[in-house]
Amino acid sequence: MEQTETPSADQLETFPNPRPERDFTIEIVCPEFTSVCPKTGQPDFGTITFRYTPGESCVELKALKLYLQRYRNKGIFYEAVTNQILDDFVAACKPRRCEVTSRWTPRGGITTNVTCVHEA
């Protein structure tokens, strides 16, 4: 099922953190991320990794998957998409800490990794 909506924080669902009194780290790896290079129109393929310490809520994984699929046909640079994903994740989940890293497949012999961090 192809998603055509623009990605936004309200598409991310959450559930209550089962241990809000404890700091713990959740790592989510999404190895099939795609977007479109706004300069060339070619598809970009990458892996998005979330490492976060939840506050009162945790992200629901199916909603996260559907949110990320909405970037499939969106023209956006690596740096912009990584920052936007972090901003939307923080708005939806309100984590104590969150790090989003995008690792992109090589293009022209160059590999790019982008890491964005939020500290509450």
Kindly label every feature range from the protein language model.
Residues 1-120:
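N-terminal intrinsically disordered, cationic/polar leader segments
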